[in-house]
């Protein structure tokens, strides 16, 4: 007999507390579903912005004497193109959290409203990516973080 690991994070209910972090496995519906079907309690999409971004040129991962160093530069297809992937993961039964980012509170709120259309369960705000000057600035200023969170929460009905 298995253990009941159901977890609640605010209004968001998870079948267990393991969550795929935002990253390269969160770019397509099939990859999100692979992680979901492997037992994750929720899956988080790759961070997405209003417009597409190519990120840094290769190599984005290099081996060092101490291990691996990764710097992707927030590549993403833009919110319009990721909606189908999010919908596919939702149709497969996954609990989906969309990771969003922008240059200011209005852009964060816009992207959050767009991903909400795909019926995602919650929104994650990428507030502190060290590879983005705007996000680095936002993440270091509590007042800016508060403004982004407030703006985003005002714009969506799902948990932020």
Name each model-derived stretch.
Residues 1-160:
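Flavin-dependent oxidoreductase catalytic cores
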């Amino acid at each position: 007999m298995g253990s009941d690991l159901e977890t609640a994070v605010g209004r968001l209910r998870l079948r267990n507390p393991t969550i795929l972090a935002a990253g390269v496995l969160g770019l397509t519906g099939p990859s999100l579903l692979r992680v979901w079907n492997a037992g994750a309690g929720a899956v988080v999409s790759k961070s997405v912005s209003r417009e597409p971004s190519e990120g840094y040129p290769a190599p984005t991962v290099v081996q060092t004497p101490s291990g691996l160093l990764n710097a992707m530069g927030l590549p993403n297809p833009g919110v319009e193109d990721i909606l189908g992937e999010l919908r596919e993961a939702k149709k497969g039964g996954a609990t989906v959290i969309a990771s969003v980012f922008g240059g200011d509170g209005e852009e964060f709120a816009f992207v959050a409203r767009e991903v909400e259309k795909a019926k995602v369960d919650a929104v994650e705000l990428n507030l502190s990516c060290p590879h983005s000057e705007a996000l680095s600035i936002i993440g270091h200023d509590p007042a800016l973080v508060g403004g982004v969170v407030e703006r985003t929460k005002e714009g969506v009905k799902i948990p932020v």
